[in-house]
Curated annotation (Swiss-Prot):
Highest taxon above the source species: Eukaryota
EC code(s) of this entry: 2.3.1.-
Cited PANTHER family: ACYLTRANSFERASE MBTK_IUCB-LIKE CONSERVED DOMAIN-CONTAINING PROTEIN, LYSINE N-ACYLTRANSFERASE C17G9.06C-RELATED
Identification of the protein by name: Putative O-acetyltransferase SAT14
Organism expressing this protein natively: Stachybotrys chartarum (strain CBS 109288 / IBT 7711)
GO BP annotations listed: siderophore biosynthetic process
InterPro entries the record matches: Acyl_CoA_acyltransferase, Acyltransferase_MbtK/IucB-like
Function: Putative O-acetyltransferase; part of the satratoxin SC2 cluster involved in the biosynthesis of satratoxins, trichothecene mycotoxins that are associated with human food poisonings. Satratoxins are suggested to be made by products of multiple gene clusters (SC1, SC2 and SC3) that encode 21 proteins in all, including polyketide synthases, acetyltransferases, and other enzymes expected to modify the trichothecene skeleton. SC1 encodes 10 proteins, SAT1 to SAT10.
Amino acid sequence: MATIPIRLQALATDQTVLKLPHPYKTEFAVRKASKASTKLPVYNLVPKPFPTRPLPFELHNDHLVFTDAIHLKSSELPPDSNNGAWARARRAPCVTLYWDGVEVPTLKQAWLVVYAFFTMRPGMDSFRLELDGNSAANLARQIKDVLLGIDHPIKARQQQEPCAKTKENTLLILRSTFWQGAGCPFGPRPVWCPQESPSSLLPSTCLSSFPLAPFHRTSTISLAGDPEDFDRCQQSWHPIRPAKPAPGSIIYSRWIPYLGEMFSMVALDPEDSEHVRLFHEWQSDPRVLQGWTETKTLDQHRRYLEALHKDPHQLTVLAKWDDSPFAYFELYWAKENRLGGYIDAGDFDRGRHSFVGDVRFRGPLRVSAWWSSLMHYLFLDDPRTMHIVGEPRDTHSTVLMYDFIHGFGLDRFIDLPSKRSAFMRCSRDRFFQSFPLEDSEKVIGGTSIRVVQKL
């Protein structure tokens, strides 16, 4: 496991600390720099000399240097009994950005430094950022305007004083807004969700170049899946869903630092023989059959995938580690899904089913990475998605434990026609607050309660 040292001075000069998602995949390392006006060690982000797709703008800035994330001395910290906004900010570590000359770093370049720190320090829910250089106040306003950061909170008693204000060049950078795409310089979609076109549009015309899918409702009648009454149907009233990404396109990617590999999700193409072959072979594995019971011929599996492709409420996905496919996901809008007939689903709530097909990529470290990344995608794909839901079998303890680890709560048990299920739900607030994207201890939803189930 590729663990990044806590302190920047311990990093090897060629160690990758950050790798941009698809399609760029540019790698960055941290190098020691110098700054005459400070005695603190300072560093610079430098791109590694590997062939990648050229960036559309300059992210690297030789003149922008930064300190490590430094905590205040214990004597300077507020007491533990003070949990106000100012006190919480003071407990957060501080990073200082320096630059010389009249050229001011761009918001894009500041975003890259923030990305590096939240990748190297995933446990930080915020950090203080001090800007030191020409026109620092203007860069600070830009960071606040895109909600990558906020003003450093003022001490409660000072708020009552008319002249009270914080240093305008000191900000509080927020992990929760960063991972939702705040300040991302690659267009209207967060960098982890490439701007791919649906198959009907030209490759140069991405769906995100249009306004967010308008809200308009329709009704759907579908089979209820009752094994005793195959003709029983259920009706749902739900928003019309946006167009699906083009089959074969990458819909999400993120470099996993503790594995040193790129996780990605590809929209499955039912006309791609390799995609169908993988699905068929994986579904023929007795281990997979225990949960999915989809014993079918190759042609039947092809028709199964074609039917899902035509269903506007479901999206089929192949997941990869680097270039190796390893898992299959079915993503759905909950309102018109079978589950929607048993819960009060929100208009944009989503759910997922999944299995790992390639046994080489099993194990808790990898599961934690793709489980959280899949959730991350569902929240990023449509900012109106407020909850992710699930309905694993109530006896499936491993799935339940992974859900608990990644921020889900057990709402109640529901009796579907084919099984008794645990209705699991995770809110957007919970996900981005507890932040399960790191390789953390196996505890329940960001608490200190350890998982006892063997994973």
